[in-house]
């Protein structure tokens, strides 16, 4: 594909852009996209849950290009929202626990994209990412989101379980990344 495709990206030519990065046929590998649990203060028992639009956009672009894609919305999957106390009793967790998320990861996952939006949650998300890599050592972990975009060198240094970071708007960067790895 043309290496300058991002500069030439025009919504009127979306199909031709996607066709340049189509998934291989009959490939059973999966791209899993995950929004992890949210962190709340110790005295908070719920927080409004928004839709994971970033992951939805990523998933939509990848699926349109033929990649098998699954989304785990650990913050918003449970209705009503589940809030539990952290194991160290210092904060609350809204959404699925680390263990519940690990159980939802498809064993055919080749790439796991994880949304790291808020720096204030990094202290809890980093050990979770390390748990993923321990259970699934062959999964390629890609971080995205505001936190990842702001301080990528720090994240890669502090969490070697993360293999790559995609900065900024990730829809087409993740598509090209996936194409090059598949």
Task: Report the location of each language-model feature.
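A cross-taxon signal for low-complexity, glycine/charged-rich
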Residues: 1, 7-9, 25
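Short catalytic helix/loop segments, enriched in acidic residues and glycine
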Residues: 48-63
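Glycine-rich beta-alpha loop elements in corrinoid/cobalamin-binding modules
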Residues: 61-182
């Amino acid at each position: 594909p043309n290496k300058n495709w991002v500069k030439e990206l025009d919504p009127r030519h979306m199909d031709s852009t996607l066709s340049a990065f189509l998934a291989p046929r009959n490939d059973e590998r999966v791209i899993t996209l995950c929004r992890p649990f949210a962190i709340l203060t110790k005295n908070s028992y719920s927080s409004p849950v928004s839709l994971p639009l970033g992951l939805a956009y990523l998933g939509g672009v990848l699926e349109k290009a033929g990649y098998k894609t699954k989304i785990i919305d650990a913050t918003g999957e449970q209705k009503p929202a589940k809030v539990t106390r952290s194991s160290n009793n210092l904060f609350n967790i809204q959404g699925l626990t680390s263990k519940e998320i690990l159980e939802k990861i498809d064993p055919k996952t080749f790439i796991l994209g994880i949304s790291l939006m808020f720096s204030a949650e990094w202290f809890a998300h980093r050990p979770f990412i390390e748990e993923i890599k321990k259970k699934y050592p062959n999964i390629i972990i890609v971080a995205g989101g505001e936190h990842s975009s702001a301080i990528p060198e720090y994240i890669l240094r502090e969490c070697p379980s993360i293999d790559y970071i995609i900065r900024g708007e990730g829809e087409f960067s993740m598509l090209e990344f996936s194409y090059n790895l598949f």
